[in-house]
């Protein structure tokens, strides 16, 4: 008799993806983030669903409905803060996941990588629209500033902005459509994740050495299922500690003030996970130039497979490239810090230098260093 797990049309898909999947024997904890992102997505959809049951997408009641969730709904505060801090965890894992891909050369799986970059854009769009929903000061002004950037697009810009707003300013129509998109996007993201995994399973996972591991594979279950469960346990401990002890640590106090179109906050800034891109945007004293730099700061990820000039795939055995990689990480941390600072001296100059260094490192330094390493190894 055949095993149902291997013969049933639906169950065998799960079997080939999570049970009998041949996986490299040497993948480290850096390979845990994919599963953690999956758990994050599930958690966000679940908590978001319960929040949507009590939320009202109307400018007059949105802020009050969020307050009502926190005060009157059973464990509403828990659901709300798990959703808000879950988004932060999501982005931490996303950045680790991308960093892992860059360090170990996983971007040479071009289909998987490009779908991943599109996923990043989709998640960023979802998070941005979610931040608008509580209709606090930073929600309103964040939405105004970011949507206004589209007016920099030549010819169609101003019309496009009014079309997105559904009027002549960020108002009821904007909030309603942002709620609709914020609700639907995670399901589109889920579908994209499935495509991401489909492409990944065509090639199999990369590993820290960057070499072909076909000769040394182990079954995903039980080895990596137990490893993933440990990662999930650590994630839940971190998330619940954040939610229970310092739920507002990563938020903005301005968002506890209801949105007021007549009063601009002194410092308009997005959530922490967008600050690096926001710093790049602000470092260019031209609207269109800033918007292009902002888009290319993420889109540049798609160039990694093209810019790869080393004879080795991974950075594991390339100390010079490793130095540059960590320089890039430090650079992004500096950009994140600058994004949260007011637009004044010396922050403007630091931001401009960090923005130039970001693009220079990726486009010039990393490929040329890889070529130099090839030469040093007489390859």
Curated annotation (Swiss-Prot):
Membrane topology per record: Multi-pass membrane protein
Binding-site positions, a ubiquinone: 201
Cofactor detail note: Binds 2 heme b groups non-covalently.
Residues given in the record as heme b b562 binding sites: 83, 182
Major location (coarse): mitochondrion
Keyword match Heme: yes
Pfam families per the UniProt record, alphabetical: Cytochrom_B_C, Cytochrome_B
Named cofactor requirement(s): heme b
Residues the record lists as binding heme b b566: 97, 196
Transmembrane stretches, start-end: 33-53, 77-98, 113-133, 178-198, 226-246, 288-308, 320-340, 347-367
InterPro entries named in the record: Cyt_b/b6_C, Cyt_b/b6_C_sf, Cyt_b/b6_N, Cytb/b6-like_sf, Cytochrome_b, Cytochrome_b_C_euk/bac, Cytochrome_b_N_euk/bac, Di-haem_cyt_TM
Annotated Gene Ontology cellular component terms: mitochondrial inner membrane; respiratory chain complex III
Sorted UniProt keywords: Electron transport, Heme, Iron, Membrane, Metal-binding, Mitochondrion, Mitochondrion inner membrane, Respiratory chain, Transmembrane, Transmembrane helix, Transport, Ubiquinone
GO biological process: mitochondrial electron transport, ubiquinol to cytochrome c
Keyword Electron transport appears in the UniProt entry: yes
Gene Ontology molecular functions: metal ion binding; ubiquinol-cytochrome-c reductase activity
Disulphide bond pairs: none
CDD domains per UniProt: cytochrome_b_C, Cytochrome_b_N
Location(s), subcellular: Mitochondrion inner membrane
Quaternary structure annotation from Swiss-Prot or TrEMBL: The cytochrome bc1 complex contains 11 subunits: 3 respiratory subunits (MT-CYB, CYC1 and UQCRFS1), 2 core proteins (UQCRC1 and UQCRC2) and 6 low-molecular weight proteins (UQCRH/QCR6, UQCRB/QCR7, UQCRQ/QCR8, UQCR10/QCR9, UQCR11/QCR10 and a cleavage product of UQCRFS1). This cytochrome bc1 complex then forms a dimer.
More details: Heme 1 (or BL or b562) is low-potential and absorbs at about 562 nm, and heme 2 (or BH or b566) is high-potential and absorbs at about 566 nm.
Biological role stated in the UniProt entry: Component of the ubiquinol-cytochrome c reductase complex (complex III or cytochrome b-c1 complex) that is part of the mitochondrial respiratory chain. The b-c1 complex mediates electron transfer from ubiquinol to cytochrome c. Contributes to the generation of a proton gradient across the mitochondrial membrane that is then used for ATP synthesis.
Protein known as: Cytochrome b
Originating organism: Ctenomys coyhaiquensis
